[in-house]
Every structure is written in C-alpha cells, then in structure tokens.
Swiss-Prot record:
It comes from Thermococcus onnurineus (strain NA1). One of its GO terms (molecular function) is structural constituent of ribosome. InterPro entries: Ribosomal_eS17, Ribosomal_eS17_CS, Ribosomal_eS17_sf. The gene is rps17e. GO terms for biological process: translation. NCBIfam families: PRK01151.1. One of its GO terms (cellular component) is cytosol. This is Small ribosomal subunit protein eS17.
Length: 67
C-alpha cells in the first residue's frame, strides 16, 4: 500500500512544479533545497514531504504517466 499525502502538500507541490518546472530534478536532496528557497515552510517534515512529492511528479512526467 502506498502513502496518502495531505491535500496541502499536493497543492503546494503542484503549484511549485507548475511555476518552476525546470528547477526540479529526480534528486530528492536538490529538490529539498529548492523547496526551502522557494517557499516559507518552516517545518522540516513538511518541506521534506513536499520535496518528495515533487520528486515523484518529476519521475511521473519523465515516464509519461502525468496528465
């Protein structure tokens, strides 16, 4: 079974991915730094979850599974 992410995390991740698609890669550590720069999220846990979901979105886009 997979993890179900909160709507807040999905919304913020999709907004960032739509605004800055060229700044994110398949590397989680890189995405984590970019999320920290582009948002005002102070919680490390929330930042990591957003970065993880963005990493997943990048992979889905490269595989052609994203709408």
């Amino acid at each position: 079974m997979g993890n179900i992410r909160q709507t807040f995390i999905k919304r913020v991740a999709r907004e960032l991915f739509d605004r800055y698609p060229d700044q994110f890669t398949k590397d989680f550590e890189h995405n984590k730094k970019k999320v920290g720069e582009l948002t005002n999220v102070t919680s490390k846990t929330i930042r990591n979850r957003i970065a993880g979901y963005i990493t997943r979105l990048v992979r889905m886009k490269e595989e052609g599974k994203m709408l």
